[in-house]
Amino acid sequence: MTVYKVPQKEFAFILDEIVGYEEHCKMPGFEDASRDVIDAILPEAAKFFEDVVAPTNYLADSQGTQLIDGVVQTAAAFDGVYQQMIDGGWCCLNGSTEYGGAGLPGVIDVASQEMLQSSNSALSLLPMLSRGVIHALNLYGSDEQKNTYLENIITGVWSGTMNLTEPQAGTDLSAVQTKATPDGDHFLISGQKIYITWGDHELAENVIHLVLARIPGAPEGNNGISL
């Protein structure tokens, strides 16, 4: 069984001596995230990732993910674990309170991410990809899109992905050929994407895909790619 111990003294040193958290939490919006509050949250996070998530690391790698009758089945070791992440609010600690998040500073979410990545790197990619979708929606999403997607993704009920890679386009995104054709208030997507991290699974109720594609008339190369 995998054994992982969170270096809590190192975390405290970083928060106090490098980040200067006592001043950091005085920033607008973080008034309720005092050092005392964080001192209560991080040990609970450590306990969860040490006791619940870390034991899945070896087991999940041994069991693997399977495609059964066209349905993706993740490792049995994950049964109930991701739901506990949702229930504990560990999927995205800095998610906006407006959309069901805890509204904590990003540095605290990073601490939680490090614990998850250290306890099970494969599972950590699930909320990591969701964070990318959350970030994109926060920056560029319409109010309708934010209201439709953010709460479920921030809480982890839904997960998100980024669809980049194609058979002929790996790290060279200028070779992306997938097309997005406008059709009323939406787009028709045509093309093939491969190697999409956590692209399909049963742990979340829904999987939201952000797709890199080209709209009609787009120039060649990276400048012609839309999200």
Give residue spans per PLM region.
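Short, well-ordered loop/turn and helix-capping segments at boundaries between secondary-structure elements
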Residues: 20-21, 118, 135-143, 155, ...
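Core alpha/beta catalytic barrel or barrel-like domain that forms the active/cofactor pocket
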Residues: 92-97, 119-134, 156-166, 226-227
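Internal maturation/activation junctions in enzymes
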Residues: 129-130, 141-185, 192
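A short core secondary-structure module
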Residues: 186, 190-227
